[in-house]
Structure formats: C-alpha cells, structure tokens
C-alpha cells in the first residue's frame, strides 16, 4: 500500500499539485488523525497523517488524483464535561472540502452519542469529501465594483428565483446556471438591480427534525461544508463550481455584482443531540463556544455557536471568505447573525475576525453586510459594527411599516429613518450607505403579505404556528388573506406603492426582496425556511404586472436624484434635503413630534416627495415653482401643478420642477 509522505501544513484542505494530493487538518486536541480513502467500490483504506506541525495534521498521498473520495477519523478523548467528543468510529467531513458526495440524512449512525459514545461505524453511509482540481477560464472578467451610493440589492434564493420561470429552459430552472441565463440577466437589468444577493449556496443539511416531518431546510442556513457549493442547485454536482462561476461571469458582464449570504455563526451539528458531521468530532473544544459544563453556548438559536475568537477558527473563516472571492469572484458577503463574528465572548469592534478582515487585502475590498444581532445578551449591535461593514437596518423596516400601515409614528422618527438613520450610523467615518434599508427580507412577511395579513400563518412548518415573529407591523386592511373587493385591492396596492417608494427613494442602500416587485405571497407564512414548494418559488406570471413597472420606474428615478446617489450625509442648508409641512413651510418642533402624517421632502432642490399618510384626502400646498408628476406617478394627462396637490388618503406622489 502507498504510504503517506509528511507533506506540508498549508494550505488547509486537500490540494492536488499534479503529482498527488496534500491533506491538512486542524485539531489542537486530537491524539491521532486517520485519512480514509474510498475506492470506486466503497472499500476504505486508512492512513495515519504523519505530519504534525503545531495544531495542524498533514500528509501527502503520491499519485492521488482529483475525484478521490476521502474523510477523516480523529482519535482523542471522549470527555463531554471538558468539551471533548472524539469518536474515531465516525467518518468526518473535511471542513475545507470543496465538494461533497452523499446526502446528510437523519440516521442514528450519524450521531456520536450524547453522554456515552456510539462506537458503531458509519463509513458506509457517511457523506465523503471529493478532491477537486481548479482550472477555470475567467476570460476578461472584472468585478463591477458598483459604488455603494449607486447600489441596489436584490435578495433571492437560487432555486426559488427561477424554478417556475417559463422563459428559462426547464432543464436548468432552479440552478446556478439559470442565474446567468440572458432572460434572468435582462430582467435584473431592466428592473435596475446592481447586486444579486443570494441566500446560502454553501453545502447545508436539513435538520433531522424537519426530515422526520417530511420537510427540508429550504433557505440553507444550516451549513455543513463552507467551501463546497450546495449540489442540489447544480445541473450536475461534478460541474457545480463551473456552473456557478459561469453565472457570476455572465452577471459581471452585465454590470451586476454577486453577494453571498454566508453562515459563520453555527454549524449543522446543532446541539448535543444533533448529528456528528465534522467540527464536533475534529476539535469540539476549539471550534465551538463551550460552557463550563461542556454544553454549547447557544447564542444563535441553532444549538451551537462557532468560536470566532479562536485563532484557528479565525483562520478557517478567513480562508473560506477568501476562497469565495478569489476562486469564484464574488463581490461581497452578507453575514448571518453577524454579532457572533465579534464575540470574545462580549461583542467588540476589534474582535479577531473583524481585525483579520480589515487587514486582508482581498476581503477589505469587497462589500460586507452584517445582520447585526444574535440572540445572546448584548446581541443587538445595530450601528456598532466596524466601518468596513454595512448593516441591515431594522429601524427602517419597522418605521416604514408603522408609518404607512396605520401604526403611530411621529414625523421626526420617520424622517430620521428616511435620512439613513444618521443617529445610528453616522459615526466612525461611516457613510449613509452603511444603512441597508429594507421593508421585507426572506425572513418575515413578503411585501404583499404585509398588506394582506395581520397575523402569521405558519401552520405548514409543523410547529403549531409557534415559530416566526409576532411583531410584523402589518395591516390586512380589513380582511385577513388574499383577494377581496376592488376597493380593498386598491387600498392594499396603494400601501405597497407607498412602502416601495419609501424604500427606493430613501437615503441609504435599498434591498428589495425578490418577488415583492410582482406581488409574491407566501400566504401569511412569515418563516418559510422549510417550505421548498410553490409557497416560496416565485410565480413569474405576474412579472409583467403594473407593480413590476412601478418598481423599475422608482429604481431608475432614484438613480437620477443626486442627494440619494452621492452617498454624503445631509446637512442643514446643503441643498440635498428640505423637510416641509403641508403648507410648504419648514416643520415646527411640535409638528415633528405631534403633527399629522403629512410631509413634503424636497431632494436636490428639484425632486419633491409629497406624502399624505392620513385617513383623509388633504390639500398639499407645493413649494413655489412649476411641478410635474414624474414616473411612476405621472398619468397620461400630466398637467403642470403650481399650487396644490390633492393628496389621497394614504397617498404620495413624486414631482419634479
């Protein structure tokens, strides 16, 4: 049998050099590491990794080739109270594997044991890693590098975006390849999108609980191999990487950036009763935050929390991010539950991973977006991330919904959110683009459901409607559910128009949820993470609707307004913004706090947003000048208005002079 040479301790993972494969694995507490190679018949061959440099185990297998399937068995103590759960009976995934062969099924053999180890061997059913070789012709690909001030983000799910698209070939619908199809790219361009933000594409697993209910993890926030693409989104698992890069190359040629939603806060191994796939069996004590009793700190709500203050885990996370940028040319990341990235365990702006990103010449140059919270004490960190990061602005989301969907909100609070929440983000040299403004996202009601449902309807998730937030700030306008009288439909449409206008004409970086622009509904499900069906797949039959045209017109209008694209904080008297009451006069202190929800926002001295969010038709006196309503608010008969606009209830209009 061929013996392993010592090899090199870097880089991490399995790397083919044309003559063989170098294998490396981090484990600070292991006593022995076996590399397990599987031939075409499934026969296993084991080799001890002979090299041990610091905490890195390594070895080199001559004559090994791409396509080789492998895994690890890691020997060490079984001491749960101290956080050690080594079990060499279980085959483990390389955390840096680039491709996985096999499925992560709910099976007792994929568990290591709770208090006592389960020594039943699982190699016959455990997924295997695959050695890959990286040769790809990027041609003249270059990142679009869209300025933050001009960025329009479109959040989408790889499968759900195209699975029902009638103009995309059936054989590629719901795949990476479909993202780069001309039909999809033309749609995004016509809409005005500059950045496609994808829900997780790294290999993930469905939780055992969901599998037992006949459901699956649809969103993908349950990672198991952070360097490997999820194979279900590929036409062929063997070509997944090239399919993904082909799509990115095509999107780049159209000037569209690609941002990946990435999950660095927890793994699919869940709590102590969860499966054993990789990190828990490699070095549980190093990879996770461990309590004094040996259990996990569950700061994510998913059972475990990655210890991103440990130097080796920081190196792992940094290498993962660099891989996606350097190998796949992605343009940025949205970090799920990103407060975990700054835990030491308390949250710090100079936490090790933040510092590593700041100092990296690759990662410091891409777009970085934080979901700025986790569920631990002190986990709400909106506005507190390092200057390189933009952040999801939930203040904006809640204020926009409260203002337009009939909840009490003072004009001052609304204006503050409209002005990029400067009270939150104007610090440490940050710009207005640091505020990622959103009204909806994958997590929560869709925009249409915000105006059709007062309550969540998550029964299909199998948790008796207990899951999902109850703080929706929604308004069904008098009837729970879709459909209704013509008057009801029109009132809901007006609310959708108002929310979209607020989102797309506010200062900050707007993020649009895919499908909101043509009225996609999840029938009141505000936590559709396990619904891989028509509830979440976009119905493109409405894509040519008036709402789609309305949204596109708003985006193109935004790009014409200097105050919104110059990415500078608005200051008193700088000509960027004036806040006026219904009589075209500056608002008084009392009006800001107690006045009716009527407001005029003059941007760049030429564009006027007139707002009447009250229940009554109201005359709005426009500032001096000749004003025209502009698309998408202009009708066929578009006379010059010099004095008064009849503002309908819950209405708004945009004018230009």
UniProtKB/Swiss-Prot annotation:
Belongs to the glycosyl hydrolase 13 family. The gene is glgX. It is an enzyme of class 3 (hydrolase). Gene3D superfamilies: Glycosidases, Golgi alpha-mannosidase II, Immunoglobulins. SMART domains: Aamy. HAMAP family: GlgX. Residues 460-479 are annotated as: Disordered. Removes maltotriose and maltotetraose chains that are attached by 1,6-alpha-linkage to the limit dextrin main chain, generating a debranched limit dextrin. Keywords: Carbohydrate metabolism, Glycogen metabolism, Glycosidase, Hydrolase. The record marks 443 as: Transition state stabilizer. GO terms for molecular function: glycogen debranching enzyme activity; hydrolase activity, hydrolyzing O-glycosyl compounds. Its EC number is 3.2.1.196. It catalyses: Hydrolysis of (1->6)-alpha-D-glucosidic linkages to branches with degrees of polymerization of three or four glucose residues in limit dextrin. It comes from Escherichia coli O17:K52:H18 (strain UMN026 / ExPEC). This is Glycogen debranching enzyme. The active site is at 336 (nucleophile), 371 (proton donor). Pathway: Glycan degradation; glycogen degradation. Pfam families: Alpha-amylase, CBM_48, GlgX_C. GO terms for biological process: glycogen catabolic process.
């Amino acid at each position: 049998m061929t013996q392993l040479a010592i090899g090199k301790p870097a880089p991490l993972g399995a790397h083919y050099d044309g003559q063989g494969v170098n294998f490396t694995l981090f484990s600070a507490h292991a006593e022995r590491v076996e590399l397990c190679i599987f031939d075409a018949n499934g026969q296993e061959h084991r080799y001890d990794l002979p090299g041990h440099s610091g905490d890195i185990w390594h070895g080199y297998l001559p004559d090994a080739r791409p396509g080789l399937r492998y895994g690890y068995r890691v020997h060490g103590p079984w001491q749960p109270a101290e956080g050690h759960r080594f079990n060499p009976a279980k085959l483990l995934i390389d955390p840096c594997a680039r491709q996985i062969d096999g499925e992560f099924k709910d099976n007792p053999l994929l568990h290591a044991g709770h208090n006592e180890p389960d020594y039943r061997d699982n190699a016959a059913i455990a997924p295997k890693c695959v050695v890959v070789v990286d040769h790809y012709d990027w041609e003249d690909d270059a990142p679009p590098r869209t300025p933050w001030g001009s960025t329009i983000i479109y959040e989408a799910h790889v499968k759900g975006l195209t699975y029902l698209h009638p103009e995309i070939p059936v054989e590629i619908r719901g795949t990476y390849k479909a993202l780069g199809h001309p039909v999809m790219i033309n749609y995004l361009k016509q809409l005005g999108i500059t950045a496609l933000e994808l829900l997780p594409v790294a290999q993930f697993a469905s939780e055992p609980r969901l599998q037992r209910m006949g459901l699956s993890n649809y969103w993908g926030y349950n990672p198991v191999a952070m360097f490997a693409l999820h194979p279900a989104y590929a036409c062929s698992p063997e070509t997944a990487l090239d399919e993904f890069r082909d799509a990115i190359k095509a999107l780049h040629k159209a000037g569209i950036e690609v941002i990946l939603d990435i999950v660095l806060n927890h793994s699919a191994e869940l709590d102590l009763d969860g499966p054993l796939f990789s990190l828990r069996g490699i070095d549980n004590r190093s990879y996770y935050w461990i309590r004094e009793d040996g259990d996990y700190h569950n700061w994510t709500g998913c059972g475990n929390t990655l210890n991103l203050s440990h130097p080796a885990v920081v190196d792992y996370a940094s290498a993962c991010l660099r891989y996606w940028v350097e190998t796949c040319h992605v343009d940025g990341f949205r970090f799920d539950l990103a407060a975990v990235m700054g835990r030491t365990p308390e949250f710090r702006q100079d936490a090790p991973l933040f510092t590593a990103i700041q100092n990296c010449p690759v990662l410091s140059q891409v777009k970085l977006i934080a979901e700025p919270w986790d569920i631990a004490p002190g986990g709400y960190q909106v506005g507190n991330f390092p200057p390189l990061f933009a952040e999801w602005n939930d203040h904006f989301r809640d204020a926009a919904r409260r203002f337009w969907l009939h909840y009490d909100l003072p004009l001052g609070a609304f204006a503050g959110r409209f002005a990029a929440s400067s009270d939150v983000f104007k610090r440490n040299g940050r710009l207005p683009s640091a505020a990622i403004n959103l009204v909806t996202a994958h997590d929560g009601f869709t925009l249409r459901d915000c105006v059709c449902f007062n309550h969540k309807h998550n029964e299909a998730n199998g948790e008796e409607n207990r899951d999902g937030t109850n703080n929706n700030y929604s308004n069904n306008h008098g009837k729970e559910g879709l459909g209704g009288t013509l008057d009801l439909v029109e009132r809901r449409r007006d609310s959708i128009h108002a929310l979209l206008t607020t989102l797309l004409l506010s200062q900050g970086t707007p993020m649009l949820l895919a499908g909101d622009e043509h009225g996609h509904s999840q029938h009141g499900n505000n936590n559709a993470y396990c619904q891989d069906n028509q509830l979440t797949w976009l119905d493109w039959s409405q894509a040519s609707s008036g709402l789609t045209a309305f949204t596109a017109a708003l985006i193109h209008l935004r790009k014409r307004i200097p105050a919104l694209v110059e990415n500078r904080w608005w200051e008193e008297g700088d000509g960027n913004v004036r806040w006026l009451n219904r009589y075209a006069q500056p608002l008084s202190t009392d009006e800001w706090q107690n006045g009716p929800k009527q407001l005029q926002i003059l941007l760049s001295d030429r564009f006027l947003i007139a707002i009447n969010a009250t229940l009554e038709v109201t005359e709005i006196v426009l500032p001096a000048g000749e004003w025209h309503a502009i698309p998408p608010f202009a009708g066929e008969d578009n006379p010059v208005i010099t004095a008064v606009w009849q503002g309908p209830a819950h209405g708004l209009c945009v004018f230009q002079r």
